Amino acid sequence: MKVEELIERINYLYKKSKEEGLTEEEKIEQAELREKYLKNIRSNFRAQLESIGGVSKKQS
């Protein structure tokens, strides 16, 4: 799933949760999508820092 699609789905589920609520399956999906998005952000940020140089790789 592309980042744009991921964000679109996260936003859709957020809006739906505010308007009418989510099913248990949708709540699980929302949590999984958010975690996937955050992992992507962390990975990109780490790669950017490493490209600058002088940053040691640390296990998280």
From Swiss-Prot:
Main location: cytoplasm
One Pfam entry name: DUF896
Gene3D superfamilies from the UniProt entry: Helix hairpin bin
Signal peptide: none
Subcellular location, record wording: Cytoplasm
Keywords: Cytoplasm
A GO CC term attached to the entry: cytoplasm
Similarity comment: family membership: Belongs to the UPF0291 family.
Protein name as it appears in the record: UPF0291 protein CTC_01690.1
Lineage: Bacteria, Bacillati, Bacillota, Clostridia, Eubacteriales
